[in-house]
């Protein structure tokens, strides 16, 4: 686990596969957005409870706890970050469940980085005083 710098936005990237997390980190870092990573749902919840996380990107199929299980547990917290859910098996049922739990966005895997960055920019603008790094 990586500790966040409180002066910037922090995005949680949670998936057991490291490759896309590293790519997203490299894309967000120049924007002034820091990332913290978790390899399973339990680590994701621990980071959400211990760090100031502004948005959480969660894989629906993670070990220990899946992304929707994490979202359900986050909703019981006092101040949970908005979530973006990634899935390689998008179904109407999953989409309905995710939207019912107020997931901000559901994206298919493999991850389209442009869509993910756009979703992150929208979620940070919406939930954090319309501020995206570089906005005037």
Write out the residue ranges for each language-model feature.
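The short loop immediately C-terminal to the conserved phospho-acceptor aspartate in CheY-like receiver
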Residues: 17, 61-64
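Two-component/phosphorelay signaling modules centered on CheY-like receiver
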Residues: 18-36, 101
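Acidic, metal-coordinating helix/loop segments flanking the phosphotransfer/catalytic sites
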Residues: 37-55
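Acidic catalytic/metal-coordinating carboxylates
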Residues: 40-43, 65-69
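Short amphipathic alpha-helix used as the core "switch/output" element in two-component signaling
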Residues: 46, 68-79
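The feature encodes the CheY-like receiver
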Residues: 63, 87, 110
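Alpha4 helix (beta4-alpha4-beta5 surface) of REC/receiver domains from two-component response regulators
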Residues: 69, 90-106
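C-terminal output helix
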Residues: 93, 111-121, 128
């Amino acid at each position: 686990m990586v500790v966040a710098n409180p002066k910037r936005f922090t995005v949680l990237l949670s998936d057991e596969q490291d490759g896309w997390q590293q790519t997203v980190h490299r894309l967000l870092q120049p924007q002034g957005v820091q990332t913290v990573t978790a390899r399973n749902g339990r680590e994701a919840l621990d980071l959400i409870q211990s760090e100031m996380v502004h948005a959480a990107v969660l894989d629906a199929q993670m070990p220990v706890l899946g992304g929707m299980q994490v979202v359900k547990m986050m909703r019981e917290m006092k101040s949970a970050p908005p979530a973006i859910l990634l899935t390689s098996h998008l179904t109407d049922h999953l989409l309905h469940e995710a939207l019912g739990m107020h997931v901000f966005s559901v994206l298919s895997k493999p991850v389209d980085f442009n869509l993910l960055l756009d979703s992150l920019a929208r979620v940070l603008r919406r939930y954090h005083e319309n501020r995206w790094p570089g906005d005037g």
